[in-house]
A protein has these predicted regions:
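Soluble non-cytosolic domains of exported or imported proteins
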Residues: 36-40, 53-64, 136, 140, ...
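Bacterial N-terminal signal peptides that target proteins for export
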Residues: 1-10
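Metal-dependent amide/peptide-bond hydrolase catalytic core
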Residues: 24, 72, 253-349
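Acidic/His- and Gly-rich active-site-bordering loop/insert found
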Residues: 24-134, 144-161
Length: 349
């Protein structure tokens, strides 16, 4: 796995170096040489970050760890962007493009169950629940790779032109409910405009990708991610006499089935892929009392804006109609988190 990570990191460097070199002849061996030297450090950084993960908008120690290293390279470092974001700037003092490299820093509320010396033992509170914290999505690797890229490109400074902006983004998984954060907030705070960035390059590791390869394509590449919350309201009653109330648990279960019907029967999957998943459902406080309300929360993934709008309308219609048909009501809220990751065809080619 580490070899896969480091190969991807090396290839990512190769993507941007041609934009920054006055002449491209011989840059591959030079990058390979420097990447090989930094490999032990990348492994060390990744294991440290993996052992001490932090949730979205709570990446305080991670940001401090990253900023301290970037400052040791002599880079201009900015902290506190979008709460915990870190930006470092490498100026070659020669005219050329401004190219950004980006990595995400946050972990997930997941208990790590592997027996490794650098396994996470961290715990935190998420939405009122005590949870384990784990880098289950590879962001520890992304951060370590970008730290390595910063070192390699700093060592190549005299050979480059233009400027490199290293962006370490918090809250890629989405800011906690009621908070702002992530890429949108970084952009709003001027991380691109203030630095006059011409292009941004990023990557995401994938355990399904063959070791030693990298996959990319022009256009829509990674799906938009939206969050939805559905509150089903019925009528509370005793579990022994359900006919005297309106059971929101049963209504919610039918809505969940209906959401899957949207994807499997109302979406033309030969033209566009889509996913609707419910990740949380909560209601009631006692086993023998039918609750008044059930709340569910989930995610919507699409690769095209038109499909995104259609699914939003379908979810509203499905939830409210099913609830009404069973004597209940459903309130639907949909939050657009991140748009489709769109690769500029010119930069991709």
């Amino acid at each position: 796995m580490l070899k896969q990570h480091l190969t991807t990191y090396l290839l990512a460097l190769m993507f941007i170096v041609p934009f920054l070199l006055p002449a491209q002849n011989g840059f591959v061996p030079r990058v390979e040489e420097l990447a090989k030297k930094v490999e032990p450090e990348v492994i060390q950084w990744r294991r440290h970050l993996h052992q001490y993960p932090e949730l979205s908008n709570r990446e305080f120690k991670t940001a401090e760890y990253v900023a301290k290293y970037l400052k040791s390279l002599g880079l201009e470092v900015q902290t506190g962007i979008a709460h915990t974001g870190v930006v470092a700037i490498l100026k070659t003092n020669k005219p050329g493009p401004v190219v950004a490299l980006r990595a995400d820093m946050d972990a997930l509320p997941v208990v790590e169950r592997v027996n490794l010396p650098f396994a996470s033992k961290e715990k935190d509170v998420y939405q009122g629940q005590n949870v384990g914290v784990m880098h289950a999505c590879g962001h520890d690797t992304h951060v370590a790779m970008l730290m390595g890229a910063a070192k390699v490109l700093t060592q190549m400074k005299s050979e480059l032109r233009g400027t490199v902006v290293f962006i370490f983004q918090p809250a890629e998984e989405g800011a906690p409910p009621g908070e702002n954060g992530g890429a949108k907030m970084m952009v709003e705070e001027g991380v691109l405009s203030k630095n006059k960035v011409n292009a941004v390059f990023g990557l995401h590791i994938n355990s399904a990708t063959e070791v030693g390869t990298i996959r990319y394509r022009p256009g829509g590449t990674m799906a938009a991610a939206d969050r939805f919350v559905i509150k089903v309201k019925g009528k509370q009653t005793h579990g022994s006499t359900p006919w005297t109330g309106i059971d929101p648990v049963i209504v919610a279960s039918q809505i969940i089935q209906g959401l899957q019907f949207i994807v499997s029967r109302q979406t033309e999957l030969t033209k566009e892929a889509a996913v609707i998943s419910v990740g949380r459902i909560q209601g009631g406080v006692r086993n023998n009392i039918i609750p008044e309300e059930v709340e569910m929360e989930g995610t919507i993934r699409t690769l095209e804006t038109g499909m995104q709008d259609k699914l939003h309308a379908d979810i509203h219609r499905t939830a409210t109609n099913i609830a009404e048909s069973m004597g209940a009501t459903a309130e639907v809220e949909i939050f657009k988190y991140v748009p489709v990751t769109y690769n500029d065809p010119k930069l991709t080619d």
